[in-house]
Amino acid sequence: MKLIGMLDSPYVRRVAISLQRLGLPFEHQSLSVFRGFSEFESINPVVKAPTLVCDDGTVLMDSSLILDYAERLARPRSLLPDDVAGLRQELRLVGLGLAAMEKAVQLVYEERLRPAEKRHAPWGERVGGQLHPARRQLEGAQLLQAPPGGSDALGQAAITVAVA
């Protein structure tokens, strides 16, 4: 498998760390969706990071979908709890971490990539108003719960929140 994308992306980091923790071998190709647009487009015409090129050539994108695939490949190893209550709590934290990532990336795009004369202050305030509650809820969360099997490895919620 080959993971395509820059490690400055929290989504690419999330996939890379998770693949390592699951014990799945992969090659990483550090390719920017900005500076390497044409090369990225030749791999994935949608130009979305992370992109995973599977061993059979199938191209997957979106960190959550890639990790769903990885979880199935790695069975019985998993970064998610087996029990429904534990899974529900883990997915709640993953959702908060993903929301924090998404809103932080939106703010970076708005503040660093959009020309100053085209920025819309109410939009930035709205995005910040979504980011801060997600981070506040994560601050007190119990993230260091071991995944199934009594392993001392971090679970998916801890990985997702750490890279956010």
Residue ranges of predicted features:
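GST-like domain detector, emphasizing the conserved glutathione-binding G-site
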Residues: 1-121
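GST-like fold's C-terminal all-alpha helical module
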Residues: 97-164
